[in-house]
């Protein structure tokens, strides 16, 4: 019920459900492709789907029925869970449950691992570049999301491609993030010739925080869904805060640019 308004809700993608399987996610989507359908069926998962629940769990924004922008929130989703035979309660880890029973302890409260390895203070490696105040991520659809660093707030404000602020629908103020994470993954075409499959075991990436830039490597973690390493291969815990994560593949021409205040490209050697 704490989930804020999110959207537009679009096609479900098995990439995200696979990546976040350890988080016990509740898929929320508006339809899906065959690969996602097969994944959900294989693992006996059911999504809250706008094509099934319609306006019982989703709103369509200020558009007419011919071109709705489907959005939802935690309260709206919670209202339809019982009718879909779904629950938002966390499942108990079988191994932990067995250990508690054997030791005679009170059963542990189910938890999920953190998504990101974070810290509130502690050592950080030297940044690979300073003055990282402008960033742009180009996605395969041709759309570009931009960010500008605000030294007063220490956050990266989100911008539309034309430079206008991207407003948070819940607060009506510009969306802003403490951390920008751009993660790269090797990708290969699937047999339908249109969609891509991704390597979810490891890849490279960038971390921006406080106007600084680090080159990182990511893998699947144990204490958290992701594990990060700095340019020297040492474990890295990013600073706690609101984080934006962009996922870029290796085949579709997606790209990221990071610039200083003078417009110099910080990713060029």
Tell what function each PLM region has:
Residues 2-269:
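A surface/extracellular/periplasmic glyco- and lipid-processing/surface-interacting theme
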């Amino acid at each position: 019920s704490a989930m804020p308004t999110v959207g537009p809700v679009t096609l479900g993608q098995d990439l995200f459900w696979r990546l976040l399987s350890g988080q016990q996610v509740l898929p929320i989507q508006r339809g899906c492709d065959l690969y996602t359908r097969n994944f959900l069926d294989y693992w006996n998962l059911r999504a809250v789907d706008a094509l099934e629940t319609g306006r019982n769990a989703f709103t369509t924004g200020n558009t007419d029925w011919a071109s709705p922008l489907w959005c939802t929130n935690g309260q709206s989703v919670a209202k339809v869970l019982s009718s879909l035979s779904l629950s938002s309660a966390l499942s108990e880890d079988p191994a932990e449950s067995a250990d508690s029973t054997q030791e005679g302890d009170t059963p542990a409260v189910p938890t999920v691992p953190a998504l990101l390895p974070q810290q509130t203070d502690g050592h950080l490696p030297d940044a690979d570049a300073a003055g990282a105040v402008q960033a742009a991520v180009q996605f395969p659809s041709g759309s570009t999301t931009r960010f500008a660093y605000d030294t007063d707030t220490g956050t990266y404000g989100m911008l539309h491609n034309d430079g206008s602020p991207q407003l948070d629908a819940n607060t009506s103020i510009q969306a802003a993030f403490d951390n920008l994470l751009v993660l790269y993954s090797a990708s290969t075409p699937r047999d339908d010739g249109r969609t891509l499959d991704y390597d979810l075991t490891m890849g490279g990436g960038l971390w921006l925080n406080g106007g600084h830039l680090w080159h990182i490597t990511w893998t699947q973690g144990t204490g958290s869904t992701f594990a990060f390493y700095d340019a020297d291969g040492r474990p890295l815990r990013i600073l706690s805060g609101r984080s934006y994560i962009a996922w870029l593949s290796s085949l579709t021409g997606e790209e990221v640019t990071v610039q200083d205040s003078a417009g110099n490209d910080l990713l060029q050697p």
